[in-house]
Swiss-Prot record:
Its main location: secreted. Monomer. Homodimer; disulfide-linked. Belongs to the BPI/LBP/Plunc superfamily. BPI/LBP family. The cytotoxic action of BPI is limited to many species of Gram-negative bacteria; this specificity may be explained by a strong affinity of the very basic N-terminal half for the negatively charged lipopolysaccharides that are unique to the Gram-negative bacterial outer envelope. Residues 184-248 are annotated as: Central sheet, part 2. SMART domains: BPI1, BPI2. Residues 426-445 are annotated as: Central sheet, part 3. This is Bactericidal permeability-increasing protein. It is found in: Secreted; Cytoplasmic granule membrane. Residues 249-419 are annotated as: C-terminal barrel. It comes from the Eukaryota. GO terms for cellular component: extracellular space; membrane. The gene is BPI. Keywords: Antibiotic, Antimicrobial, Disulfide bond, Glycoprotein, Immunity, Innate immunity, Membrane, Secreted.
Length: 445
């Protein structure tokens, strides 16, 4: 309800401005002035000076969407009037106070199946005006007593019909375009985009408004459905924040699939990429401390490590935390004097990392920390050797060089599916089984 109240506050501010733009047509008619017969009056230059909406509310309307209700609204209308009977002409200014205005409207929420875009329409609207009071600013105000009831009734009926017209129009011309700022498909880089389209119409219940988004990465050049399905999510019922966003492991794992298939996880390391202060070096001399045959066969040469991810990394979220596993092939080469490469060995690396996910500027950001690293010798051109001899070097290379580069990219952030100008604050992130739950308050501006 806190989120609905804030949305109500923002929406009613827009509606108020639109209602104050109502154009009221001139009102003309005849009146009787005994014993002199009939006269004519005309009310013109009518302007809505203020339209106050003091008690707005938005409530959930199950199976429809939202119900907007406003009570005790009041309107001030100003203008000019003139009356004539024979050679007698009078004119002046007037104020009309319209009080006790009540408005009720249902906003039906839906979606366009072909695009997954959210829609909102005004499915019903009614308004009622309790009373209208006419006051003249001229010394001829007594003339108004001859026809004030007709004017009050006419202007009350006019305002009654205009209110729902304006509300319905505002929903289609203001609210719907704003809803359309919810991102559908957003290209992130030359490789991937993210699909946030709706997979079903929004669903209103007695205590929540739920939207199911696809939450899937896709290859911008060759989009294709992933070979796995999203896991079910048992989302807890929480009400401390305005909105809650459940982010399934499916989102992150489709990202891993797309980037791995595009070859974006490849990385080449050379000695000049190792921190200068480090004792560990990518040279045959340093490698020869663990593998003497390397230094003998390729003396005083630099070493190149080429890393490629052999299968998509897999992220798993549990209440205890977030883990990511990856299988990496590491090919080691000696760089010969003519800059050609001589293959040394091929290792298979199984990485177990812990992941921290946070937020920055309305984006999800991540950071990986190396946990356990398991080595396997897949092929060797320098003879067989125990892979444990390279454990310390590989731990260092992964922790000091590879993961910092990965984390640098993860800090660029993943945009959250928020409409335009919505900012999040008071964020809280909770890991659950197979999904991450983000709770936040929102502000517009």
């Amino acid at each position: 309800q806190k989120g609905l109240d804030y949305a109500c506050q923002q929406g009613v501010a827009v509606l108020q401005k639109e209602l104050e733009k109502i154009r009221i047509p001139d009102v003309s008619g005849k009146f009787k002035l005994r014993p002199f017969g009939k006269g004519h009056y005309n009310f013109h230059s009518l302007v809505v000076r203020s339209f106050q909406l003091p008690n707005p509310q938005i409530r959930l309307q199950p199976n429809v969407g939202l119900r907007v209700s406003i009570s005790n609204a009041n309107v001030r209308i100003g203008g000019r009037w003139k009356a004539r009977k024979g050679f007698i002409k009078v004119r002046g200014k007037f104020d009309l106070s319209v009080e006790g205005v009540s408005i009720s409207a249902d906003l039906k929420l839906g979606s366009v199946p072909a695009s997954g875009r959210a829609t909102v329409t005004c499915s019903s609207c009614s308004s009622n005006i309790n009373r209208a009071r006419l006051r003249s600013q001229a010394s001829w105000g007594g003339w108004l007593k001859l026809f004030h009831k007709r004017i009050e009734s006419s202007l009350r009926n006019t305002m009654n019909s205009k209110i729902c017209q304006v509300l319905t129009s505002s929903v289609s011309s203001k609210l719907q375009p704003y809803v359309e700022t919810l991102p559908l498909k957003e290209r992130l880089d030359s490789v991937a985009g993210i699909d946030y389209s709706l997979v079903a119409p929004p669903r209103a219940t007695a205590d929540s408004l739920d939207m199911q988004l696809k939450g899937e990465f896709y290859n911008v050049a060759r989009p294709s459905p992933p070979p796995f399905m999203p896991p079910p999510m048992a989302i807890p019922s929480l009400h401390d924040r305005m909105i809650y966003l459940a982010i399934s492991d499916y989102l992150f794992n489709t990202a891993a699939l797309v980037y791995q298939q595009a070859g974006a996880f490849g990385l080449t390391l050379r000695d000049d990429m190792i921190p200068k202060e480090s004792k560990s070096r990518l040279t045959t001399k340093f490698l020869g401390k663990a593998l003497p045959q390397v230094a003998k066969m390729f003396p005083n040469m630099n070493v190149q490590l080429t890393l490629s991810v052999s299968s998509p990394p897999h992220l798993t979220t549990r209440p205890t935390g977030i883990a990511l596993t990856a299988a990496v092939d590491l090919q080691a080469f000696a760089i010969l004097p003519n800059s050609s490469l001589a293959s040394l060995f091929l290792l298979g690396l199984k990485l177990n990392t812990s992941a921290k996910i946070g937020t920055k500027a309305d984006k999800l950001v991540g950071e990986l920390t190396l946990g356990r690293l398991i080595l396997e010798l897949k092929h060797s051109n320098i003879g067989s050797f125990p892979v444990q001899l390279l454990q310390a070097l590989m731990d260092y290379v992964l922790s000091a060089v590879v993961l910092p580069k990965v984390n640098e990219k993860l800090q660029r952030g993943l945009p959250l599916p928020m409409p335009r100008k919505v900012q999040l604050y008071d964020l809280v992130l909770q890991p659950h089984q197979d999904f991450l739950l983000l709770g936040a308050n929102v502000q517009h501006g």
